[in-house]
Structures are given as structure tokens and as C-alpha cells.
């Protein structure tokens, strides 16, 4: 699917430089995936979505808004939301936006082979 979407400021409705950035496009794609799953949540359709690094390099306020949005949609539509996050990208989150033990399924590290996804060092 090809589409063009631009970010406009709310007051003057003019396109801003945010529309040209990689972070904006990443969030737009993630929101589209999530909206699609929400729309089809009552049908025989996928019940999960996976996004890699969608919070990377995002402003802290946007991270918190996105986490709030994902939690709401996942609970409301019974969707499993799978997200990869680099730990350093979550340090500044306020406590209510930090991931709970119930939300974290796997923690990977490069400290030892056992902490890697396939438990193998190359």
C-alpha cells in the first residue's frame, strides 16, 4: 500500500518538517497497523502486531502518549502488542508509563550467550 501523509501544525494547517522525518513515518506505520487490527478485531483476523524500535529517538512526551494509546487499544480490542525497546529509551518515562512485569515477556542482553535470543555467541 502506498500513501502520502503529511504532518500539519494545528493552527495554520501548513506542512511541517516533521513530515519528512523517519520517526514520524515509523509512528504513522505503527498507528496504521494498530488501527487495522482494531477495525478487524471482531473478525477472524490477526490478533497481534509486532513493531521493532517504534519508540527509538522519539520525544519523551510522544513515547508516553504512544504507550498510553497502545495500552488502550490492546485492552479494548483484545490485541497482543509486541514491541522491542532498548532499555535506555525508557529511562525518562514517568512511572505510570514504565512497563510492568506483566507487560514484559523477554529481556535480552549481550552480557552472556544465555541472555541472547538464540542463546548462541558468534
Q: PLM ranges: what are they?
A:
Residues 52-54:
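Walker B catalytic acidic pair
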Residues 40, 63-64:
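Single-residue recognition of alpha-helix boundary sites
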Residues 20, 39-43, 73-77:
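Conserved catalytic network of the ASCE P-loop NTPase/AAA+ motor domain
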Residues 1-20, 40:
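Extended helical coiled-coil dimerization/tether regions that scaffold
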Residues 65-122:
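C-terminal lobe/lid and adjacent interdomain/linker elements of RecA-like ASCE P-loop ATPase modules
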Residues 7, 25, 48-50, 64:
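Structured extramembrane domains adjacent to transmembrane segments
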Residues 23-47:
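GG-anchored amphipathic helix commonly corresponding to the ABC/SMC/Rad50 NBD signature/C-loop
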Residues 59-60:
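Conserved D-loop-proximal element of ABC-family nucleotide-binding domains
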Amino acid at each position: 500500500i502506498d500513501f502520502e501523509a503529511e504532518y500539519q501544525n494545528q493552527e495554520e494547517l501548513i506542512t511541517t518538517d516533521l513530515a519528512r522525518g523517519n520517526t514520524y513515518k515509523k509512528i504513522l506505520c505503527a498507528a496504521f497497523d494498530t488501527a487495522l487490527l482494531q477495525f478487524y478485531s471482531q473478525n477472524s483476523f490477526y490478533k497481534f502486531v509486532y513493531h521493532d524500535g517504534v519508540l527509538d529517538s522519539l520525544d519523551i512526551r510522544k513515547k508516553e502518549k504512544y504507550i498510553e494509546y497502545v495500552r488502550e487499544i490492546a485492552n479494548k480490542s483484545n490485541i497482543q502488542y509486541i514491541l522491542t525497546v532498548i532499555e535506555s529509551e525508557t529511562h525518562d518515562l514517568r512511572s505510570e508509563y514504565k512497563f510492568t512485569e506483566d507487560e514484559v515477556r523477554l529481556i535480552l542482553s549481550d552480557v552472556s550467550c544465555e541472555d541472547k535470543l538464540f542463546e548462541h555467541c558468534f
